[in-house]
UniProtKB/Swiss-Prot annotation:
This is Nuclear receptor coactivator 3. The modification Asymmetric dimethylarginine is found at R1178, R1184, R1195. A motif (LXXLL motif 2) lies at residues 730-734. Residues 1-25, 396-512, 530-611, 625-668, 697-724, 748-788, 805-839, 891-1054, 1296-1323 are annotated as: Disordered. The gene is Ncoa3. Residues 439-460, 503-512, 642-664, 965-987, 1300-1317 have a biased composition (Low complexity). Nuclear receptor coactivator that directly binds nuclear receptors and stimulates the transcriptional activities in a hormone-dependent fashion. Plays a central role in creating a multisubunit coactivator complex, probably via remodeling of chromatin. Involved in the coactivation of different nuclear receptors, such as for steroids (GR and ER), retinoids (RARs and RXRs), thyroid hormone (TRs), vitamin D3 (VDR) and prostanoids (PPARs). Displays histone acetyltransferase activity. Also involved in the coactivation of the NF-kappa-B pathway via its interaction with the NFKB1 subunit.
Length: 1398
């Protein structure tokens, strides 16, 4: 078998191989059908054989054949099968090969169509030039490029279509002899290297008349073409044919009109060219914004060209009608945002496919947006300013205007009008040359889209312009970009990069984070002009529309009628709003006066301000930067005066610095930038200690300067690195994750004197201050400043204790506080300066930096500068702080100038107008805001001593009333009594003079409030802890208890305070109602309550809020941020200048709501409600005690630490939330029942599921006994509520954190007003609070309103956010604030009179 198998199979295999040979050469035999038939037969044979063998394989296996033989057989069969498969494949390929691929097959592309296709692919046309230079052939598509027809060019000279300047080159290359030589070279050189020439070819004009009438430029239009020249093909020449030598050229456009995929849309037109249809699908699908605008503008531009121009849409369609297609040259237009768009339209004639009649045109418009990002537009040297020669300062004549090139920039040519105003928004072209020698002047700001160019040299409105020779002095690096950093579009530095930009006349901060620029400038050792004084206000309210910060420039005993005037206080706001009061003639006059004074002030204070500005810039929130370009830059005219009174070299600086308050949500990137700047400082050789010192100096130096300003010896307080941990600030800034911290915002890295070069925007503006500063200003040694620092520490302690800035280091140690609080000092507390100063010069509202005038209370940096007033220093008794707070309120409004107090005169508390110096009005205001009155009213502790917070009336309060002052005094007395009592009972009250907790602690906008901040003060935070927004529920004014019990500046103090509070709580808890009443009587609370009620009735709606007054005041400070709406818009400070849109109470509330939402500490801004003080005192005490316990118990209690980023836990036990005594508790219980019912009804009425919010079980307040909850837990819970609810909901009554605000409505006073069942706190938590029963009038309604503003908090205390779904209801049901304002029949809940007035 084996033999048989071998002999039989092998021959078959051999035969198959032989037969396969033809297959191996498919090119030959396969052509014939016979070969094909033979192959098919072979395939069949092989297939049959394979099947036969495979069928017998099983039998073969049984044969007695050696295994190797079987394997061979199997392998043979496998090969046969492969051959069969290959045969099938080859046979299937034969047909294709024969038809299409074989050399005999027909070509795929017709030769006639190949040429045009190639030309189309090349995007060019072909022409052939003979040795005489004549065109012997040109392709038909030349019409698309040169508008010439084929017959127009054939047999014409190629030179006729070449641009004259290029003809010579062409002639030199292609003259006959050279052409021949060239062609000869082409024969010898590689054909792959064609000769390439760029030429401009003439395009045909459309009609003779146009040629005759138009100018040569119009008649002759050229298209730049790239020519690829080749000699005649060698093959043609070698064939011996007598062909004339010629050159073949392909000309193509140099660059395609739209290299990248352009946007496009299609329009259909009738034969007359009218638009019939617009197809936007392609544009819409591109997902690019503003496609409607681009279509509208493109069509408008397309149809706008007239026949008199090189082309028109009419001619375009005529050409399309004749030729069937046409295309326009590239044309351009700009979009609304200034983006330049290049467009080209190609049209085709549309015919009816059946009748071939012309029906119309289809036009495709190709659009290409040009990259118009920040492209520095070199300023023509003949225009604007030329870069100064190296070494020369740029002296710009006042008349030199740099017009901003930015698409949106508005050049203000009039130097008198513009000048240094360039405040944040005025991107006066910082283009003013950078002062640094050799640096060419770049005016990136000129490109700032939003910046408004002010003439660089023009003096600030109110301030005398710098003489050309002076201009170098005032340059603040901040205005300029840091030298190496191109100024950001919105960067204040928009102008020259050099740190010392020309006297910051250009306030080009347009909207950039000047802080970064300043830091960079510092890190880079940018200019050293301290004159520019970095006082550029880092945080400028500028952005906050309403925040006017009036700063009495002239601190020394002068009543600055317009703080602006004195301070030149063109508030940064002014610059941003263009409202600066300084613009007013009075302001100018005042600024001039102050400028006279400026010379008196030493340069040090100014420098310190500059540093503060830097620190502020560094730390200011992104929002602040973005909105308020930090400050008026040197442009601020105010700067001048400010130097005197405020000491901020740039008068504005302090004012501006105070203002940066816009809240920005873009913190991460800013924070990173800040970190980079700090790291750069370190890398540049600055030790951490030096950096810390710089920042400390920046923030704290000026404090005392104001006070001494009158003396003409303003001292800069420099935080002594010795006193502070040098690295503390730096570490804090680098480690801090919450860019929203107000403190951080305020802490502006201020360069040390060297760094002050950066002088933030405010510095350079004041020529006078700058000039005078130079020689006179000197920084005092740390030792010299220590006294001031102590004062400042006292104030800073308060600030730190406030949620503003938790600084564990603040400890009790003033130095540490200052360093930690460099920011606070920037807050405006420079040095407390003897708090008792006769008349606290009000800080320029804006300038947190401005030092307090002599004898003035430490100027609290206007928190207003910070978003929100959270900061408002509650330095009790510090009128300045109060002022700033009010300024906050005033500034909060979109119009900073609008007086915040609806009732008060501008001079009054609210002076919304920065110009109205609070100081003056104070003198006359019933509240006696005058410094003297203030002093009297506010017991001012010695330096560092804390003054019990005087509940200042919020700007919003209807009118300053003398009675309020009395109440304040009474409250202060009560506070003191309580302190004594507490000390006696628990020795709890360990008031650290520097530690008065500032209610302002919460970042105005930081939801986390300070809670996010590494909680130096978990407890201090409590006082501020209102809620993310600074405990909206808490009275804006800090409760006196809070002041007394104010969280210590350091963690240690906090723990001590907690222990004391726990003890006190235990004591009070164990005390029966009778004992509590005795304590109340001992404190004089009953009388205060009675008075408070009377006052409340007087207070209008405010009084109802009086407990809320604290809140209201804060609100005032916060201004009607929302008025009714809760959206906590920082920028939306509803024209704080404006009176609250709703009732003042509501306005306040809304303000509070908004700011609290901002994470501001309600308390921060407010002093305390005057009328509610008694209630507040006692309730606060209880609340704080219970609150702490509750916080421990409550899941919502956010550890009382600033840590809580959300600030939900912001409410801290410290918060004076309504506290109920036993009687009140009983009343509350009764009320709870009714309120629960009412709430349920409310819930049913409201679109949102309020039942949950109000259902007793959910409501912590409801389910737990009201008193228990209210007393302790309610407050802590409130915080969670704050942010959960919509901003507007905050306005809603339902949220009404009855406890928020620390108004402690539950106090006896509250209960008396509320009535047994109307405990405001209880009610507020309940939906019914929205429409509190008329019984609740007075206090409750006020509370309600406030609650509306801070509903989250107030409810939050209840502890169940859901419980306060009412607040959420606000969002669904509309603004609760509005509801509160309009008495709605809520389950029979009559609104209190106060509310009714809302």
């Amino acid at each position: 078998m084996s033999g048989l198998g071998e002999s039989s199979l092998d021959p078959l295999a051999a035969e198959s191989r032989k037969r396969k040979l033809p297959c191996d050469a498919p090119g030959q035999g396969l052509v014939y059908s016979g070969e094909k038939w033979r192959r098919e037969q072979e395939s069949k044979y092989i297939e049959e054989l394979a099947e036969l063998i495979s069928a017998n394989l099983s039998d073969i296996d049984n044969f007695n054949v050696k295994p190797d033989k079987c394997a061979i057989l199997k392998e043979t069969v496998r090969q046969i099968r492969q051959i069969k498969e290959q045969g099938k494949t080859i046979s299937s390929d034969d047909d294709v090969q024969k038809a299409d691929v074989s050399s005999t097959g027909q070509g795929v592309i017709d030769k006639d169509s190949l040429g045009p296709l190639l030309l189309q692919a090349l995007d060019g046309f072909l022409f052939v030039v003979n040795r005489d230079g004549n065109i012997v052939f040109v392709s038909e598509n030349v019409t698309q490029y040169l508008q010439y027809k084929q017959e127009d060019l054939v047999n014409t000279s190629v030179y006729s279509i070449l641009h004259e300047p290029r003809r010579k080159d062409f002639l030199n290359t292609y003259q006959n002899p050279q052409l021949m030589e060239f062609l000869g070279l082409m024969r010898t050189r590689d054909k792959k290297a064609p000769y390439i020439l760029i030429v401009r070819m003439l395009m045909k004009t459309h009609d003779i008349l146009e040629d005759v009438n138009a100018s040569p430029e119009t008649r002759q239009r050229y298209e730049t073409m790239q020519c690829f020249a080749l000699s005649q093909p060698r093959a043609m020449l070698e064939e011996g044919e007598d062909l004339q030598c010629c050159m073949i050229c392909v000309a193509r456009r140099v660059t395609a009109p739209f290299p990248s995929s352009p946007e496009s849309f299609i329009t259909r037109h009738d034969l007359s060219g009218k638009v019939v249809n617009i197809d936007t699908n392609s544009l819409r699908s591109s997902m690019r914004p503003g496609f409607e605008d681009i279509i509208r503008r493109c069509i408008q531009r397309f149809f706008s060209l007239n026949d008199g121009q090189s082309w028109s849409q009419k001619r375009h369609y005529q050409e399309a009608y004749v030729h069937g297609h046409a295309e326009t040259p590239v044309y351009r237009f700009s979009l609304a945002d200034g983006t330049i768009v290049s467009a080209q339209t190609k049209s085709k004639l549309f015919r009816n496919p059946v009748t071939n009649d012309r029906h119309g045109f289809i036009s495709t418009h190709f659009l290409q947006r040009e990259q118009n990002g920040y492209r520095p537009n070199p300023i023509p040297q003949d225009k604007g300013i030329r870069p100064p020669a190296a070494g020369c300062g740029v002296s710009m004549s006042p008349n030199q205007n740099v017009q901003m090139m930015g698409s949106r920039t508005y050049g203000v040519p009039d130097p008198s009008n513009t000048g240094q105003m360039g405040g944040a928004r005025y991107g006066a072209s910082s283009s003013v040359a950078s002062l640094t020698p050799g640096q060419s002047l770049q005016s990136p700001s000129s490109y700032q889209n939003s910046s408004y160019g002010l003439s660089m040299s023009s003096p600030p409105h109110g301030s005398p312009g710098l003489g050309p020779n002076q201009q170098n002095i005032m340059i603040s690096p901040r205005n300029r970009g840091s030298p190496k950093m191109a100024s950001h579009q919105f960067s204040p530095a928009a102008g020259a990069h050099s740190p010392m930009g020309p006297s910051g006349n250009t306030g080009s901060h347009s909207f950039s984070s000047s802080s970064l620029s300043a830091l960079q400038a510092i890190s880079e050792g940018v200019g050293t002009s301290l004159l520019s004084t970095l006082s550029s206000p880092g945080p400028k309210l500028d952005n906050s529309p309403n925040m006017n910060i009036s700063q009495p420039s002239k601190v020394s005993g002068q009543d600055s009628k317009s703080p602006l005037g004195l301070y030149c206080e063109q508030n940064p706001v002014e610059s941003s709003v263009c409202q600066s009061n300084s613009r007013d003639p009075q302001v100018k006059k005042e600024s001039k006066e102050s400028s006279g004074e400026v010379s008196e002030t030493p340069r040090g204070p100014l420098e310190s301000k500059g540093h503060k500005k830097l620190l502020q810039l560094l730390t200011c929130s992104s929002d602040d930067r973005g909105h308020s370009s930090l400050t008026n830059s040197p442009l601020d005219p105010n700067c001048k005066d400010s130097s005197v009174s405020v000491t901020s070299p740039s008068g504005v600086s302090s004012s501006t610095s105070g203002t940066v308050s816009s809240t920005s949500n873009v913190h991460g990137s800013l924070l990173q930038e800040k970190h980079r700047i700090l790291h750069k400082l370190l890398q540049n050789g600055n030790s951490p200690a030096e950096v810390a010192k710089i920042t400390a100096e920046a923030t704290g130096k000026d404090t005392s300067s104001t006070a001494s300003c009158g003396e003409g010896t303003t001292r800069q307080e420099q935080l002594s690195p010795k006193k502070k941990e040098n690295n503390a600030l730096l570490r804090y800034l680098l480690d801090r994750d919450d860019p929203s911290d107000v403190l951080a915002k305020e802490l502006q890295p201020q360069a040390d004197s060297g760094d002050s070069k950066l002088s933030q925007c405010s510095c350079s503006t004041n020529p006078s201050s700058g000039q005078e500063k130079d020689p006179k200003i000197k920084t005092e040694t740390n030792d010299e400043v220590s006294g001031d620092l102590d004062n400042l520490d006292a104030i800073l302690g308060d600030l730190t204790s406030s949620d503003f800035y938790n600084n564990p280091t603040n400890g009790g140690h003033p130095g540490a506080k200052q360093q930690m609080f460099a920011g606070p000092s920037s807050l405006g507390l420079r040095s407390p300066q003897p708090v008792q100063s006769v008349r606290p010069p009000y800080n320029r509202a804006v300038s947190l930096d401005s030092p307090v005038s002599v004898g003035s209370g430490p100027p609290v940096k206007n928190v207003s500068a910070f978003p929100g007033l959270p900061k408002q220093p509650i330095l009790a008794g510090n009128p300045r702080m109060m002022d700033s707070q009010e300024n906050y309120g005033a500034n909060m409004g979109p119009n900073r100038n609008v007086p915040v107090n609806p009732t008060s005169s501008p001079g009054d508390w609210g002076l919304a107008n920065s110009r109205a110096s609070r100081m003056e009005p104070l003198a006359s205001s019933p509240l006696g805001r005058t410094g003297a009155d203030y002093s009297a009213t506010l017991p001012r502790p010695a330096m560092g001593g804390s003054v019990p917070t005087l509940p200042l009336r919020s700007n919003r309060l209807p009118g300053a009333r003398p009675s309020l002052q009395q109440q304040q005094q009474q409250q202060q007395q009560q506070q003191q009594q309580q302190q004594q009592q507490q000390q006696q009972q628990q020795q709890m009250l360990q008031m650290r003079t520097g530690e008065i907790p500032m209610g302002m602690g919460v970042n105005p906008y930081s939801p986390a409030v300070q809670s996010n901040q590494p909680g130096s003060w978990p407890e201090g935070m409590l006082s501020m802890e209102q809620g993310p927004h600074g405990s909206q529920n808490r009275p804006l004014l800090r409760n006196s208890l809070d002041d007394l019990l104010g969280p210590p500046s350091n963690a240690e103090g906090q723990s001590d305070e907690r222990a004391l509070l726990d003890q006190l709580h235990t004591f009070l808890s164990n005390t029966d109602a009778t004992g509590l009443e005795e304590i109340d009587r001992a404190l004089g609370i009953p009388e205060l309550v009675n008075q408070g009620q009377a006052l409340e009735s007087k207070q209008d709606v405010f009084q109802g809020q009086e407990a809320a007054v604290m809140m209201d005041q804060k609100a005032a400070l916060y201004g009607q941020t929302y008025p009714a709406q809760g959206p906590p818009l920082q920028g939306g400070f509803n024209l704080q200048g404006q009176s609250p849109s709703f009732n003042s109470m509501m306005g306040q509330i809304s303000q509070q709501g908004s700011f609290p939402l901002q994470g501001m500490h309600p308390r921060a801004g407010l002093v305390r409600p005057r009328t509610n003080t008694p209630k507040q005192l006692r309730m606060q005490l209880q609340q704080r005690l219970q609150g702490q316990q509750f916080l421990n118990q409550s899941r919502q209690a956010l550890e009382m630490k600033m840590e809580n980023p959300a600030g939900t836990a912001v409410m801290r036990p410290m918060m004076p939330q309504a506290f109920f005594n036993a009687q009140m508790a009983a009343q509350q219980k009764r009320e709870l029942m009714s309120h629960h019912l009412q709430q349920q009804r409310m819930a049913m009425m409201m679109s949102q599921p309020q039942p949950q919010a109000f259902s007793p079980p959910p409501n912590v307040t409801a389910s737990p006994s009201m008193d228990g909850v209210l007393a302790g837990s309610a407050m802590p819970q409130a915080p969670p509520q704050q942010f959960p609810y919509p901003a507007n909901y905050g306005m809603g009554q339902p949220p009404e954190p009855a406890f928020g605000r620390g108004s402690s409505p539950p106090s006896a006073m509250m209960s008396s007003r509320m009535g047994p069942s109307q405990n405001a706190m209880v009610q507020h938590p309940q939906p019914t609070p929205m429409y509190q029963p008329s019984d609740m009038k007075g206090w409750p309604s006020g509370n309600l309103a406030r609650n509306g503003s801070f509903p989250q908090q107030q409810f939050a205390p209840q502890g169940n956010p859901a419980a306060y779904n009412m607040v959420h209801m606000n969002s669904s049901g509309g603004h609760l604030g509005q509801m509160a304002m309009t008495p709605m029949p809520m389950s029979g809940m009559p609104m209190g009179p106060d509310q009714k007035y809302c």
